[in-house]
Amino acid sequence: MVKLRLGHEAKPEGEVQRVRAVQEAVGPQVQIMVDATESWNEGQAVAFGRALQEAGIVWLEDSMSHQNLSGLAHLSDVLDVPIAAGEHLFGLDPFQKTFDAGAVDIAIMDLARVGGITPWMKIAALAEARGIPVAGHVIPEAHVHLLAAVPNGHLVEYMPRSVPIFDSALTLEDGHLLAPQAPGLGVELNEAACEKYRVQQP
């Protein structure tokens, strides 16, 4: 799977062209996910979502404001493609309300935003009780462990780090990210590499 950021075209046809161009570049064996970064209103999300669904996407993320729970629920009802959201939610209560509203088909959780490992696991359990898969938002070094630890873990968002701050890199094998077996998160911080990015207050 690869994820494509959308949300800047005035008409659905423009976004569809982007998706088809990427699909042609990566080949038919690679599934396309899209992230609209909350760029659309509810009406646009339905129109763009239908067009993108026809283009073969397998994931529609952040189509509209995460606060528009009724709009997200409506979108989930009218589209077959899974509606993913949640990276902008902080803590357990907003996820509870989102789940109760039927606003997501896939819950995206950010370990740093929800409050750490324990709240993350509690939210994953809430999602599991409703049959909702969960995904991690960035921080793959931690999320690979969390998603392996819950029965409804769906996928890890992974991109190679442009800044090498760890002594060892995560292993990607046949499209799967392998959880390190060393203690803790299984990665060691490279103190010398981090020193280049240290910021000191005057």
What positions do the PLM features span?
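Catalytic domains of carbohydrate-active enzymes, especially glycoside hydrolases
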Residues: 1
